[in-house]
UniProtKB/Swiss-Prot annotation:
Name recorded for this polypeptide: Galactoside alpha-(1,2)-fucosyltransferase 1
Topology within the bilayer: Single-pass type II membrane protein
Pathway listed: Protein modification; protein glycosylation
Record keywords: Glycoprotein, Glycosyltransferase, Golgi apparatus, Lipid metabolism, Membrane, Signal-anchor, Transferase, Transmembrane, Transmembrane helix
Transmembrane regions listed in the UniProt entry: 9-25
Function text: Catalyzes the transfer of L-fucose, from a guanosine diphosphate-beta-L-fucose, to the terminal galactose residue of glycoconjugates through an alpha(1,2) linkage leading to H antigen synthesis that is an intermediate substrate in the synthesis of ABO blood group antigens. H antigen is essential for maturation of the glomerular layer of the main olfactory bulb, in cell migration and early cell-cell contacts during tumor associated angiogenesis. Preferentially fucosylates soluble lactose and to a lesser extent fucosylates glycolipids gangliosides GA1 and GM1a.
EC main group: transferase
CDD domains the record matches: Fut1_Fut2_like
Length: 366
């Protein structure tokens, strides 16, 4: 055999290097796609916009309780189709939207909303979940699951690829780990936010004429609850004594607050809320068919006083700050407590003031 020349040895070495590089690239390429990553991950293009619902964390991934998920993945990691039946009023559908988004991400599924929910929420918020076409809805082999109003362990491991949720979930235990993402989904459209801020900028304290330093949104739920709570649930709504105590709580802790009152019973509020101190403004229009003006006003305040109901919950959740709520508003034997857990409904840092249940005891007397 003829000995190899120096030139031949160099060429052979270069060939081995080229083949090794090609083999290494192919290995990385195949391994990346085996784990669900596309070329956009290997060579990220900042012009590509990934839908928020694509964020999904594997079980056990640590998550900050007040930020969005820290571990976004490519949308290809999601599969199936999940939606939720839109039911109830404005606050109910906000709870359904947030719960669908959170559970779908937790289970690695794609979330879609139905047209009725889009109609209710899209005029108010910059929601991003896509809408499921009616013809797709009717042809999809759904499994249906009715949720109760608190997060349960089984909801973290739902294997159904085509799932239609229902119920009235409105508990922070479903979605609080995604708080910033939820707040982003429920960002007001500019014209609503600006209109609410214009209203607040015009407010002055009655006695001094000074500008308020603290805005406290007050939502007083009345309407159908006046009958539903005592007759069906052995419960009460917030009365004037509760509202006075809640306002005094803020007066003792915040300088120069103004209380911005909204309600679906504004006439009752004007007659029963003491405005003699000059720090109460009856700002709500009370229009139940178009609640977004009142809602926008509440979310632009610094703090919240709520009575009962999902409308007040969401106003407080989005406003941030301090929240005072009506606590223990049913009798201990109320059937309502089978579907409602106070510890799952109100954030731990919120402040509860016990309701006056004496009207219920009077009704119970023979």
């Amino acid at each position: 055999m003829w000995p190899l020349s120096h030139r031949h040895l160099c060429l052979a070495f270069l060939l081995v290097c080229v083949l090794s590089a090609i083999s290494f690239f192919l290995h990385i390429h195949q391994d990346s796609f085996r784990h669900g990553l596309g070329l956009s991950v290997l060579c990220p293009d900042r012009r590509l916009v990934t839908h928020p619902v694509a964020i999904f964390c594997l079980p056990g991934t640590p998550m900050s309780p007040n930020t969005s998920s820290p571990c976004p993945q490519h949308p290809a990691s999601l599969s199936g189709t999940w939606t939720i039946y839109p039911d109830g009023r404005f606050g109910n559908q906000m709870g359904q939207y947030a719960t669908l988004l959170a559970l779908a991400q937790l289970n690695g599924r794609r979330a879609f909303i139905l047209p009725a929910m889009h109609t209710a929420l899209a005029p108010v918020f910059r929601i991003t979940l896509p809408v499921l076409a009616p013809e797709v809805d009717s042809l999809t082999p759904w499994r249906e699951l009715r949720l109760h109003d608190w997060m349960s362990e089984e909801y973290a491991d739902l294997g159904d690829p085509f799932l239609k949720l229902s119920g009235f979930p409105c508990s922070w235990t479903f979605f609080h780990h995604l708080r910033e993402q939820i707040r982003s989904e429920f960002t007001l459209h500019d014209h609503l936010r600006e209109e609410a801020q214009r209203v607040l900028r015009r407010l002055h304290l009655g006695r001094s004429g000074d500008r308020p330093r603290t805005f406290v949104g007050v939502h007083v739920r009345r309407g159908d609850y006046l009958q539903v709570m005592p007759q069906r649930w052995k419960g009460v709504v917030g009365n004037s004594a509760y509202l006075r105590e809640a306002m005094d709580w803020f007066r003792a802790r915040h300088e120069a607050p103004v209380f911005v009152v909204t309600s679906n019973g504004m006439e009752w509020c004007r007659e029963n809320i003491d405005a003699s101190k000059g720090d109460v403004v009856f700002a709500g229009d009370g229009q139940e068919a178009s609640p977004w003006k009142d809602f926008a006003l509440l979310t632009q305040c610094n703090h919240t006083i709520m009575t009962i109901g999902t409308f007040g919950f969401w106003a407080a959740y989005l406003a941030g700050g301090d929240t005072v709520y009506l606590a223990n508003f049913t009798l201990p034997d109320s059937e309502f407590l089978k579907i409602f857990k106070p510890e799952a409904a109100f954030l731990p840092e919120w402040v509860g003031i016990n309701a006056d249940l004496s009207p219920l005891w009077t009704l119970a007397e023979p």
